[in-house]
Amino acid sequence: MEGFMDSGTQTDAVVVLSLAQAAVLGLVSENELFGATISAEAFYPDLGPELTGTAMGEPGPPGPDIYQLACNGRALEEPPEEEVLEVEAAFEKHTRRKTRPPVRLVPKVKFEKAEEEEEQEVYEVSVPGDDKDPGPAEAPAEVASSGCEALVQSSAVKMIDLSAFSRKPRTLRHLPRTPRPELDMAPFDPPFPDPARDGFPEPSMALPGPETLPTECSFEPPHLAPLSNPEPPNMTSTTELVKPEQGFVWQESSEFEADTAGSTVERHKKAQLDRLDINVQIDDSYLVEAGDRQKRWQCRMCEKSYTSKYNLVTHILGHNGIKPHSCPHCSKLFKQPSHLQTHLLTHQGTRPHKCQVCHKAFTQTSHLKRHMLLHSEVKPYSCHFCGRGFAYPSELKAHEVKHESGRCHVCVECGLDFSTLTQLKRHLASHQGPTLYQCLECDKSFHYRSQLQNHMLKHQNVRPFVCTECGMEFSQIHHLKQHSLTHKGVKEFKCEVCGREFTLQANMKRHMLIHTSVRPYQCHICFKTFVQKQTLKTHMIVHSPVKPFKCKVCGKSFNRMYNLLGHMHLHAGSKPFKCPYCSSKFNLKGNLSRHMKVKHGVMDISLDSQDPMMELAGPDPSELDNHQEMEDFEENAYTYSSVDSSAEASTLTEQAMKEMAYYNVL
């Protein structure tokens, strides 16, 4: 229906028509071929008001008879119906061969060369055809007497409606055309239509250029407006659909791409944060030979090697102090998120890895493996200062630093120095306020979970650590280590008052209390006084019928471990404690002390005992005051019981339980 017409350079609004089109419309008078003028007699004033702008078909291609009629200036007569059909069919065929069909003339603005074409206006001629749906004819707009000037709408849009000069639609028979599909009122979809899907031929753009599409028909769908405005087309006004300023952009796809790009960036940032390899450049020069044709990634700062590159990157970040992952509970920093997740198990109380020997639980398998070395004698790394063995080189290196620095564990609160980190942590707990972990059996509280776990072993009567020399059992490994020193015969700690020597410093400090006159702890039954609270608790067992220490050989029970150890010498037939002044021998050190005081008048001297186990068995009789009866430690004072003693003799009475509870809270 529409086609291009090149108006050229002009100053007035002029419509240029070919001679064939003018002849068909009856606008040519008897003039020469190139000097044709518009003849007013050729108009059809009686038919003009009845014609609509869309009822008349488009002009057909010029034929020889039409040229002859136009040149002679003769009035055109009504052609026969067969000729009309032939002309219209030829016109349809001609229209498909056109490369530049005429369209309505609208001022065009080329965005790329807008400044160069400001002064030159290009117009399009639009001849409405039968592209609209057939329906009742509408009355056309009234044509003014001034001719073509009245048809010019404005200075911006200069066009002439040639439908007023068309023939009656009643005399023409249109060829069958594919009905135009209804516009989809669904949400705006920007992609170009598929001609096979939409049911109309491919459209052509207004001006030739890089964006011009091949065309077979002059029909232009409303949603193929130039792409310049993201607003969807207005379905109520067809005149606004062809305006160049009402195009659209790929809004939905761009938003989808933006969302996808945003999520990709977030995932990339998170991956960088998790991998922690954004600023560490590791090349193949870090690979070293590890034997068996294997290579490991080695750190150049500490020569530590790893099997994977990622572990080396994480290790190097540790040298730089980069720990981006923080614990929300205690604010402790970690290099990897996996380390943080493992640390969070300690706050949750989850320890899935359990030792089968001592039943101690750990959060990591590596900690359990390191702990299992405590149950073995494998210590390949030894300190060259003190000879102490270690299972790992890192432990040895940390231990040797203590020898070199001297002050490595200092409290930031009070400035006290400690030999080990464990002691410093326990001391720092005293500055933190109330305790956190409490025993459900005896209501005793502790600063650390490990202390509570070690304490619970006493209630469970679990003693997994056994001395290989004497068979004595201990609940904790450090107790066994301290006990093993007694078999070596080395006593490094000596009392400055009486000269007595001890293998452990704790035993010497406890012994030093007997030289003071202060005895703050008193028994409310016999009114005896004691230097230590632990000594008073041990004494209270004398007033109770409970005898928790039982001999495995004969089944005899004792109320003190010290007495049980002395009893065990009877089965061995040994009396390790010998008097230096006579030939008397005793199986208990307390009996020897009483013998020397009564027979020889010697109060307290350092005795070389052949039984070093006594120092770990609790306070001995020499540490008690002079008013204490020594019968408590004599073998004759024991109440011997058979193996199958009655339940009344092995259980506490209600009164005794109250007394024990009273002294436990001291």
Swiss-Prot record:
PROSITE patterns: ZINC_FINGER_C2H2_1, ZINC_FINGER_C2H2_2. SMART domains: ZnF_C2H2. Its main location: nucleus. It comes from the Eukaryota. InterPro entries: Znf_C2H2_sf, Znf_C2H2_type. There is a cross-link at residues 110, 113, 379 (Glycyl lysine isopeptide (Lys-Gly) (interchain with G-Cter in SUMO2)). A zinc finger (C2H2-type) spans 297-319, 325-347, 353-375, 381-403, 409-431, 437-459, 465-487, 493-515, 521-543, 549-571, 577-600. Residues 113-141 are annotated as: Disordered. It is found in: Nucleus. GO terms for cellular component: nucleus. Keywords: DNA-binding, Isopeptide bond, Metal-binding, Nucleus, Repeat, Transcription, Transcription regulation, Ubl conjugation, Zinc, Zinc-finger. The keyword Ubl conjugation applies. One of its GO terms (molecular function) is DNA binding. Belongs to the krueppel C2H2-type zinc-finger protein family. PANTHER family: GROWTH FACTOR INDEPENDENT 1 TRANSCRIPTIONAL REPRESSOR, ZINC FINGER PROTEIN. May be involved in transcriptional regulation. This is Zinc finger protein 710. It comes from Mus musculus. The lineage of its organism: Eukaryota, Metazoa, Chordata, Craniata, Vertebrata. The gene is Znf710.
